[in-house]
Amino acid sequence: MAMLGVTAPTATAQVGAAKKIVDAAKEQGIVGETIDGYLALVSGSASAEIEAAMNEINIRRKSVYTSLARETGTSPENVAGVSGEKLVAKARRGEKVRLSNGEWQTVK
């Protein structure tokens, strides 16, 4: 099944101030991309601002995944998984990503 356009809608799901906050948190290793298509805290907790920004982006991503699933006749989880694979693959050097085994890895 081809999932065309998964990356572009995901990008639109993370606009504005929330993206800037999360990008900074990614650079610091506080937040990372997961293989299931959502952002997560790498360990422990983060500031309320970081958690709110991460949650905002995850809510927007879920909405995009749900819309794409309706359009393509698949599940939101399937769309999220395909998107997650792409987001993990695009992570920048030094950022953390959570793989399918649940372990965090630093991108080299």
Positions of predicted regions on the chain:
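Bacterial N-terminal signal peptides
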Residues: 1-5
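Amphipathic, charged alpha-helical segments and their helix-to-coil junctions
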Residues: 15-52, 72-108
